[in-house]
Amino acid sequence: MKSIKNILWIAPVCLLSVSCNGYNKLINSNDYDAKYAAAMNYYNENSYSRAAQLFENLTLYYRGKENAENIGWYYAMSLYKEKDYFTAGYQFKRFARQFPYSDRLEEASFYSAYCKYMDSPDYNLDQSQTKEAIEEFEMFAERWPRSTRIPEVNTCIDELRKKLIKKDYEIAYGYYFIEEYHAAYESFKQFLSLYPEATMREDAMYYMLESSFLYAINSREDKMYERLQQVVNDFDKFNSSFSNSKYLASAQNIYTRTREAMANMKK
């Protein structure tokens, strides 16, 4: 009984060993047609890691040949299915450059952007990848405005912009929190210009107003009046945009104190 159990345990290990040995021999083989057939078979059986390795191995040999486009496409797709989005995105972009007349060009361009979307980090980290993804999606929408992918592209852009909105708002608020009021003012001003759709525009505009006031009131005397006048302008914009704001009482207090400071400077 014990020997039967040992056989049952050893059998799959042997099969795995044979399978691995066969795969390793295939990788080192010069039979490229067999490699190509095996790569397609692995891909169709969802063995994407092995498929990707074989397709990569075939790329140089088939360059400029009949199957080059297919290999480039399935190599990129294998990496994508393996969730290696960084390398997959690079390969989709490379495919688009190498095969500009391919029937798969639209899909390759979409996946190039989508891989950057999938690789985009949390909002509190560096957002270079996020910005690149937005740029690629916008280029895709401009080139294929009637693509069936457009709704998905727009959804992805909206999600990516939400990350940028949150990050830039927290940067601006961080300056306000540490009392760097000039930097806070400029950051909130840029935020409002860049993100007209932001849900925290009211908060941003109020903190910009308060930063404007605190920067002005602590300025040198020869600069103060001009900066106080800017506070008045900022209040007018805030009051016009959010006349029923939860910050209205505080904003009106800032306006009153600003007018008083300006009047005192004229005495």
PLM features: residue spans?
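Bacterial N-terminal signal peptides
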Residues: W9-S17
